[in-house]
Design a protein with these regions (language model features):
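Short, low-complexity, polybasic intrinsically disordered segments
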Residues: 162-187
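Surface-exposed patches in mature extracellular/periplasmic domains of secreted proteins
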Residues: 145-165
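Solvent-exposed, flexible loop/coil residues
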Residues: 131, 152, 186
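Active-site-adjacent loop/helix surface patches within enzyme catalytic domains
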Residues: 2-149
């Protein structure tokens, strides 16, 4: 695992309380870690005038880089930044249905599956096997280090929640979530 830090950015700050959430993001593109690092630094908005930040990033081949220490708050998940640790996984997320894109552009075959997120049908691409191992390893380490429960949000029927959680649900929840669970514009 290598380290790269957001030197000089004000997009990280000391953490006042222990994290209780792990937020998984996908990049929505096929670029590598260097490109992602550059994009996050340059992405600004009303809540992130100095760029976005995450604690870790994972490449298609499973390479994992730490971009900020766990004891800092990163800007990656809106209202739950203070309560969370964030990881970006280099993955297109949604599928175009193109076998060429799945195999040639990404350099590895990704499984395509269909699911519902926020009430709409979506064709998704899975993580690579190396990413799955890297994400699992990182999440387990974080759960052990910070006492975060190894769980995901479930609906009353026991199935994975595929919608944004309410502010009340987020405040009461501890565990692993997707970015779409905590942000209205993420799918």
């Amino acid at each position: 695992m290598t380290a790269r830090t957001f030197v000089g950015l004000r997009s990280v700050r000391p953490r006042a309380t222990p994290p209780r959430l792990i937020v998984l993001h996908w990049t929505g593109g096929t670029g590598g870690l260097a490109r992602l690092f550059d994009v996050l630094r340059k992405t600004t908005g009303p809540r992130s005038p100095d760029g976005l930040s995450v604690h870790y990033a994972i490449a298609s081949d499973g390479t994992t880089e730490q971009w900020a220490p766990d004891d800092l708050v990163c800007l990656h998940a809106g209202s739950v930044n203070d309560a969370s640790l964030g990881v970006e996984v280099c993955s297109p997320g949604f599928s175009t249905g193109s076998a060429w894109a799945r195999e040639k552009v990404l350099g590895v075959v990704r499984e395509e599956y269909e699911d519902r997120i926020r009430g709409r049908r979506a064709r998704m691409l899975s993580y690579t096997p190396a990413q799955t191992l890297a994400v699992t390893t990182l999440v387990e380490r974080w759960c052990d280090a910070h006492g975060i429960p190894r769980r995901v949000p479930l609906e009353a029927d026991g199935l994975l929640m595929r919608r944004q959680m309410s502010a009340r649900e987020l405040a009461a929840y501890s565990g692993v979530i997707g970015h779409y669970h905590c942000h209205e514009t993420k799918c």
